[in-house]
Curated annotation (Swiss-Prot):
Official protein name in the record: Ribonuclease 3
Location(s), subcellular: Cytoplasm
Cofactor(s) required for function per UniProt: Mg(2+)
Annotated GO CC locations: cytoplasm
Function description: Digests double-stranded RNA. Involved in the processing of primary rRNA transcript to yield the immediate precursors to the large and small rRNAs (23S and 16S). Processes some mRNAs, and tRNAs when they are encoded in the rRNA operon. Processes pre-crRNA and tracrRNA of type II CRISPR loci if present in the organism.
SMART domains found in the cross-reference section: DSRM, RIBOc
Subunit structure: Homodimer.
Gene behind this protein: rnc
Classification via HAMAP family: RNase_III
UniProt organism field: Shewanella baltica (strain OS155 / ATCC BAA-1091)
Binding site for Mg(2+): 42, 115, 118
Catalysed reactions listed for this entry: Endonucleolytic cleavage to 5'-phosphomonoester
NCBIfam families xrefs: RNaseIII
GO molecular function terms listed in the Swiss-Prot or TrEMBL record: double-stranded RNA binding; metal ion binding; ribonuclease III activity; rRNA binding
EC numbers: 3.1.26.3
Length: 226
């Protein structure tokens, strides 16, 4: 298997340092690229993500019904959410794809990106243990868990924008951090959102990258409605 570049940078982005880097390499390898691909790791990661998020929601919402807990979990672990997480990690830059998938833009394909997130979760579990994996996932999901509430619509602006573009078979939005100001504990992020249908770029500014992306996505949705 050919080496994948910049894995140390990806580890920093993921906030996890692999002891066995081959596990990360395998997690990033699509079945079109090699016999030793990421599907088994994806199977494992899917189960781990489900139990960690289920446990977090159970304790966070002691009065929520089973139905509300199920709907919130579905929102947090569904493919659209995993695709957005993959985009936040810029996983498309690190995927190992076969020539056909590479040529057809597989590094942008939602299902491939979502599967890679689950595979990385499986790889982290094998490289460490369930508690380390749980702590990492809760860090990845901290803002989403803080924002989610039972009994209300669970779709945020980024998800709604993504679904809108998918409905018209358009490419996914591109989010880029164009400026970070302030000290480490008090930063302001400026994020640019670009989509194929708009010639102009849209800017979101907030105290975290994800919040800035949500603001930019909401503004794009408003422009698309006009």
């Amino acid at each position: 298997m050919e080496p994948i570049k910049n894995l140390p940078r990806l580890c920093r982005t993921l906030s996890y340092e692999f002891k066995n880097i081959e596990l990360l390499t395998q997690a990033l390898t699509h079945r079109s690229a090699a016999n030793k691909h990421n599907e088994r790791l994806e199977f494992l990661g899917d189960s781990i993500l489900s139990i960690v998020i289920s446990d977090a929601l159970y304790h966070q919402f002691p009065k929520a019904t089973e139905g509300d807990l199920s709907r919130m979990r579905a929102t947090l672990v569904r493919g659209d959410t995993l695709t957005i997480i993959a985009q936040e990690f810029k996983l498309g830059d690190y995927l190992y794809l076969g020539p056909g998938e590479l040529k057809s833009g597989g590094f942008r394909r939602e299902s491939i990106l979502a599967d890679a997130v689950e595979a990385i979760i499986g790889a982290v579990y094998l490289d460490s243990d369930l508690e380390v994996c749980r702590a990492l996932l809760l860090k990845w999901y901290a803002e989403r868990l803080a924002e989610i509430q039972p009994g209300i619509s669970q779709k945020d602006a980024k998800t709604l924008l993504q679904e809108h573009l998918q409905g018209f078979k358009k490419p996914l939005p591109d989010y880029q951090v164009i400026n970070i100001e302030g000290d480490a504990h008090d930063q302001t992020f400026t994020v640019e959102c670009r989509i194929e249908d708009l010639s102009q770029s849209v800017i979101g500014v907030a105290s975290s990258r994800r919040k800035a992306e949500q603001i930019a996505a909401a503004q794009v949705l408003e422009l698309l409605k006009k």
